Amino acid sequence: MILLQVICTIWTCLFIPLLNAEEFVPKVTETLSEYSFSLESFDDSNSLIRLDNQVVWISSDSGENWEAVKEIEGHILELIVDPLHGQDRAFVSIHLSPKFYVTDDRGKSWRALTIPVSENCRLGTSCSIATHPTDKKYLIADCPCFINDNGYIQIQNETYFTNDGESFYNIEPSLKKKEDDHITSSSCNFVKSSKDSDIEGNDASILCLFSNHGYDSDRHLSAAYTQLALSTDGGKTFKKFDEFNDKIIYQYKILKSHIIVSTQDDRYNEMSPMDIWISNDASTFQKARLPAQVRHVHMYGIYEDSIGRIIIPISTIFTDEKNDQPAPSEILISDSQGLKFLPVEWTINPHFGYIDIASPHFLEGTIIGSFHPSFDYSHNKGKYNKKIARYETKISVDNGLTWSNLKVVDEENADSFPCDITRPERCSLQNPFYSI
């Protein structure tokens, strides 16, 4: 009898929540606006923040009630919740100003910070802020400045660092100008890109790519010099990487376990083949082995999967002048060390165009690939039939081992589709513009 009572009690505890779940109706509130607005949410809370007609509004009850922020002055350009501290921190940037505002308590209070840009810096927009994953006081500010170069407007950025969250100092490039009229640019990021980073280094360790470019009277590139350097003291001193002394560094990206650098040997030819270099310790780099020559790698599309492999989308933008057939656009995945890459057999369609990939951190082992066809008519002699290229989107849930189409789940409206959605091998969701 006692056992029966226990079983009944357990069943009641399990059954009542199920009934409540079936009866659950989400509460929806409506907020009217005469203007377009941006809306962000703080992680793990009911707090929302929105920018509406140059006013920042805060809600602590999931949008039911809103209160305007009065501390912020100036023409607001952008509102961003800190992606590394999404529970409580947000930034508001001011248009054409080195000033921005920050909150560390979900919008309850705000403080203003100003970047001490040089007198010659005429901001074309606002300064962007990079944050540290563990120490909120560490910030990097990148400020794009317009300069007049013999009647031509050029952009030359200034980079600043703070280790106390208040006062910024300029990061002087370790790559010095060879000519006074060369245009200098800098790109700096923290070596630790996430709270669980495997790359060694202190909180003040940053990696910077410095570039100098010169142009002739016809505005053609006449000189190009780059340097990748590591600083362990917040940009006060640097150590360059000798592996890249005779190369042009195109881009770099810092992941959880790897740092990826793309280089070119020909400093005057943007179409020259690229090399990919990998570092696991921010001290030395090794050249990765690729299955073929690579010409088009965009660092923003590179990811690291849940088992530490690097995923690189390779896009083909131009056909080969000697062969009118399109060169392949591929997805390459490395071994665990990131040094050997192999192509992924994810689709059988001819590839000529762009590939985007996403590897959402909240879906372990998941990769989404999307192919966008593109055509280079300058080299097309009629041998390549553009009709065979089409958009294609596939998903893998086992770190790229197998791929499948995205099934359309909409039984109520199945008749409104031009194909049979119960057969995803022939009728699937093609979404070339996704964001995860």
UniProtKB/Swiss-Prot annotation:
Listed InterPro entries: Sialidase_sf, Sortilin_N, VPS10, VPS10-sortilin, WD40/YVTN_repeat-like_dom_sf
Glycans attached where?
Answer: 157
What is this entry's stated membrane topology?
Answer: Single-pass membrane protein
GO terms under biological process: Golgi to endosome transport; Golgi to vacuole transport; protein targeting to vacuole
BNR repeat ranges, renumbered to this chain: 57-68, 101-112, 229-240, 394-405
Task: Output the Gene Ontology cellular-component terms.
Answer: cytosol; fungal-type vacuole; Golgi apparatus; membrane
Q: Which UniProt keywords apply?
A: Glycoprotein, Membrane, Repeat, Transmembrane, Transmembrane helix
Q: Which residues form a coiled coil?
A: none
Q: Where are the transmembrane segments?
A: 1-21
Query: Where would you find this protein in the cell?
Result: Membrane
Covalent S-S links between cysteines: none
State where it is primarily located: membrane
Q: Which PANTHER family match?
A: SORTILIN RELATED, SORTILIN-RELATED RECEPTOR
Q: What is this protein called?
A: Uncharacterized membrane glycoprotein YNR066C
The opening ranks of the lineage are:
Eukaryota, Fungi, Dikarya, Ascomycota, Saccharomycotina
